[in-house]
């Protein structure tokens, strides 16, 4: 508001912001801007769809498990998850141990996303992780020169992640475009036990549901809550202090593993999603390539790596499949290198035309 923003509305989100499919019993499901029969993704599905449809110029949201990145990919817009602390948290948040979610911007292009980030970023006395030394200035951003860029492509973590056919190839085509413009792109291995990282994710995410115990303990309220939230709350009941200690150490080990890669590569890349947008009547994919998903959010495992490391991550578009479904790619850099990530995203935007393909509205 101090920067002159006009707040228009709160767009649709899933119940308690859980899941990358925007549906709830109040407003129903939000359709993708390009095909309203498909999901807009989530949890900022309403924000991404409204952006793509030109209902708003920019939108903000939060991102724990891809809530800015996933709907950005499905609606062919930019979604940016900043470094932890770049945008101050809420005054009542737990500020030290369990920080997974952050607030960030979305835009129809990188320039607008940068402008909103510079408005949102800053320091706050209630957030000890805020107040980066490099104060973001809109006028200081410049598109990266590709001949100065080296990117490590993590892909599906060496076959660990199931991905719908067509996703990896579209990401690789986008990377090839950067390489043809002078960038260096190489496949890399994280050299990490990804099953260990998933266990860490479950423990830390489920533990955060302790805050919902009072709702769960009220039978009338519990009966109204979505089953996925009740499941997470039930899982949180059995998490021990030792589990959290191990999870914290695994998270630190993962951060160090990525920093080793950053010694060689300025940026790393992953797909933004493991499946293309699906029917908005389906709450979540039960399988990918006939492999069963054992939790309601396993199909979004690809986004937890940047989250657990707290790294700045941009979703950029990589095009559409033969059914017209959009997909995106995550580009992320070292902690605190938000500007560099967005400068690479800006350079990439300049060599592809995916963002110019807007939804066709009924006449």
PLM region spans:
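Short helix-loop capping/hinge segments that flank enzyme active sites or metal/cofactor-binding pockets
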Residues: 1, 143-155, 204-259, 271-276, ...
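Short glycine/serine-rich loop segments
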Residues: 2-123, 307-328
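Charged, often glycine-rich, active-site loop that binds/positions anionic groups
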Residues: 24, 28, 197-212
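A short helix-breaking turn/cap at a secondary-structure junction
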Residues: 78-173, 346, 351-363
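Short, surface-exposed loop/helix-turn segments at secondary-structure junctions
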Residues: 130, 199, 246, 278-300
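Acyltransferase
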Residues: 163-190, 213-220, 244-265
């Amino acid at each position: 508001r101090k920067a002159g923003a006009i707040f228009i509305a709160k767009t649709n989100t899933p119940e308690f912001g859980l899941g990358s499919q925007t549906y709830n019993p109040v407003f129903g499901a939000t359709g993708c801007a390009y095909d309203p029969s498909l999901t807009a993704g989530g949890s900022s599905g309403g924000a991404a769809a409204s952006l793509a449809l030109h209902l708003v110029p920019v939108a903000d949201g939060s991102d724990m498990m891809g809530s800015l990145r996933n709907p950005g990919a499905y609606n062919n817009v930019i979604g940016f998850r900043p470094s932890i602390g770049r945008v101050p948290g809420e005054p009542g948040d737990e500020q030290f141990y369990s920080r997974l979610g952050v607030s960030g911007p979305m835009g129809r292009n990188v320039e607008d996303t940068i402008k909103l980030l510079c408005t949102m970023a800053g320091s706050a006395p209630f957030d000890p992780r805020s107040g980066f030394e490099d104060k973001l200035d809109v006028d200081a951003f410049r598109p990266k020169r590709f001949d100065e860029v080296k990117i490590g492509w993590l892909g599906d973590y060496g076959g660990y992640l199931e991905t719908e056919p067509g996703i990896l190839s579209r990401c690789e085509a986008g990377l090839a475009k950067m390489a043809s413009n002078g960038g260096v792109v190489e496949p890399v291995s994280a050299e990490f036990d990804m099953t260990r990282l998933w266990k860490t994710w479950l423990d830390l995410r489920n533990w955060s549901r302790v805050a919902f115990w009072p709702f769960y303990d009220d039978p009338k309220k519990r009966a109204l809550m979505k089953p996925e939230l009740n499941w997470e709350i039930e899982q949180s009941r059995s998490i021990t202090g030792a589990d959290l200690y191990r999870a914290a150490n695994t998270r630190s080990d993962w951060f160090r593993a990525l920093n080793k890669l950053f010694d060689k590569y300025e940026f790393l890349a992953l797909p933004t999603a493991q499946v293309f947008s699906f029917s908005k009547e389906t709450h979540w994919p039960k399988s990918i390539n006939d492999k069963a998903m054992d939790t309601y959010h396993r199909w979004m495992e690809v986004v937890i790596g940047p989250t657990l490391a707290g790294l700045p991550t941009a979703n950029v578009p990589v095009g559409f499949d033969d059914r017209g479904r959009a997909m995106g790619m995550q580009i992320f850099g070292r902690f605190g290198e938000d500007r560099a990530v967005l400068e690479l995203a800006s350079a990439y935007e300049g060599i592809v035309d995916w963002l110019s393909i807007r939804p066709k509205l009924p006449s």
